[in-house]
Amino acid sequence: MNACVLSVLCLLGALAVLVEGVTVQDGDLSFPLESVKKLKGLREVQEPRLVSHKKFAPRLLQPVAPQLCSSHSALPEALRPVCEKPNAEEILQRLEAIAQDPNTCEICAYAACTGC
């Protein structure tokens, strides 16, 4: 009887983890991985400038936080609390790194990802 109850509890726990999905945590903030993935499409990719016929010079990247927080209505609601933080730029850069390769987060290669 106890084994049956334990089995049911384990299955319910596993189901709860699967339903909740992967969570990305940065400090005291946590976000669903699906919201973090949306960052990838929000930021326009800067095209490199042609310096000579063989070399490209990268442009200086514009700060991410002011652009996303003030003018981008497509910023997922779950990520909006980042805009209120004084280090929003650093947080968004870390989240963008995860957004560039979310598969790595889905297998929990990042320490910031939980719920695998």
Swiss-Prot record:
GO terms for cellular component: extracellular region. One of its GO terms (molecular function) is guanylate cyclase activator activity. Residues 1-23 form the signal peptide. Disulfide bonds join 69-83, 105-113, 108-116. It comes from the Eukaryota. It holds the Pfam family Guanylin. Keywords: Disulfide bond, Secreted, Signal. Residues 24-101 form a propeptide. Localized in both crypts and villi in the small intestine and to superficial epithelial cells in the colon. It is found in: Secreted. Endogenous activator of intestinal guanylate cyclase. It stimulates this enzyme through the same receptor binding region as the heat-stable enterotoxins. Belongs to the guanylin family. This is Guanylin.
